Amino acid sequence: MLQFSSQQMVAIKNKATQSMIDAQKNDNEVVLNNPVLVPEDGRATWNLYYFFPEHGVRLTSARDQPLSHICPVDGKEFTGEPYDGAWWRWLNGLNAKACYDLGLLWQITEEPIHLEIVREILLEYANYYPNYEVHGGIPYNGPGKANAQTLCEANCHIDLARGYDFIKQALTEQEQDKIEKRLLREGAEFLMEHRSAQLHNHEMKINATIGVIGLILDDHRYIDFALNTDYGIHYQLNHGCLGEGMWFEGSVHYHYYALQALLNFEKIAHSTPYSVSNNPNYLKMMKFPLKLVMNNGDFPRLNDSIAGQEKLTHAHLFEFVYKQTPCEEFAQVLTNIYQNISRDNIDALLYGVDELPNAEPIKCQSMHAEQAGLTICYDEARNNSMLLKHAPYGGEHDHYDRLGLILNRNGKEILPDLGTTGYGAELHYGYYKNTSTHNTLVVNQQNQSPINPTLLNYQQNEKFTLVASEANWANKPAEVDSHTLVQWNEEAYRDVCFRRAILWLGDAAVELNTVINPHQQQFDLTYHVRGTHLANEQRKSIVNPLSGALERMRDVQLIESQTEFTQCYAIEGQPEFNQHFAADREVDVVTGYAPDNPATSDIAYSLVRSNQPELKTVLLHDLSEKQTYQLQKVIWCEKQVEFSLLKSNLTRRFRYNQANNQISELAE
């Protein structure tokens, strides 16, 4: 066995608790309690088809009902494709996971049933795998054999290979030869053929699987391909890591998804000459996202992030990396993970230190990362936070939301980033992945074309913080060394320039926006608030004028020709939330409701509409508990704006210079 030495295995056996063993059995009860079932052909497709189109929630499945798929919200049954193929993908995943988990259990408990199940699964796949038809058709993805995409092939094969390593000693030479030739080598060769020449989390997974198979089979050709070729592991780390340590795709989920692949390789390779721990971006990438934990305890749902993936639950990564490279950050994140759950788990058993130090949990912190393009401002006393996304374009998993905004008040998301749902659900491409469902500028209700923003200024002192950035579509379009599908409209954004500065005061955030719109397109400054609109007698009901993702918006109302107004919202469990707005020329305001995430509830939208060649706005987001802020005395000049903020009889006056993007506080 390559994964653990005999001495390590003895120590693991001695430390294993019955609850750990029971947890492993429970996680694999479907395979343990049913006859082994392996598809005879390549009928499996894609697990992300397994979502209800309307609610965007994952369907429920049963091992004995491969043709019946149930929505957990309303009990509706779905049959046929794409759900049947997704069910078989689920089963392939269960089988592969069982190979690893039950193979490990056999090493710990020596119970024959675990060995027999793993042996049968591996031999059955070895029977069929060479003859599985290549099939695919998944957006952005290469094909598979057992499944419909190359990524899924890699995910299954890494568990099949590690499971084989656990039981190899108990197999006959003929069985070993069959599994190695007809399953593991067939899989590695297929993955090598279909690895794409791109930076991508998929390629990290594919490389890791090829490398693990190479380590287990002692095949240096596989190892070298995985590590050292163009688009291999080191290439991905060297070119896919942005300056401060963020994975270029801009999603915290896919950042750790790429690292999960890397660590699956490193857990076997760390004591060999093939360890990747000497790559300087390895630890940078492990540490950087920990700076993005918001004051609700979660990561922001930037870009593609399915509900639930924002949670900090990465024991499988940090147990290992803390033991290999102990430091305060990794001790802190393990404190977070184990705040509400026991450490009596398999990752701590296999890879963790015997006892963790007493460490403070990771907390939200103010952070400015110019190259990653993320700025967080945090007021600890009031538990408020703000995130401005001025990140470069990230490719497939991007959400076309440059200069997007997130606001949290007292630990609760007020202006959230919704993330997304399963990619097979209509709501993914039809709603969540669109510019118009983010707190940013939308032109003609079309998606922003790829652009890399420019940071204009970052100004911080004891009284306030200012961050200013610009997305200018007159500049060269953004490019990324990763496959993309065109899901944007270049013509809509041609020559448009959007400048957004945020003045952070701790209990308020003030937006200073400029939109340059030379071709006089219809544009919207869009805000969605996790709350409900309070009544406003000025609003009148209208037929929804919006196209695209917000065509589904309901209860649409309009206030016309405004230069100053206030939007008020009721927030569950908190006081009201107010937005005070001023513009240098008249705008219309459209309000309504569209899906939150999950789509079982709605979120309140406010769209500030104009088609003027230029618009300047000031927007005060009142994050105070008593909602006592007022926006007053806004004076527009050609290159600057002055405004006053009144709170509890205290007035503060500011001047923002749009020529140099500096802000100063004036004496009243």
Model-derived regions: residue spans:
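Long, repeat-rich segments with strong aromatic
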Residues: 230-269, 506, 521
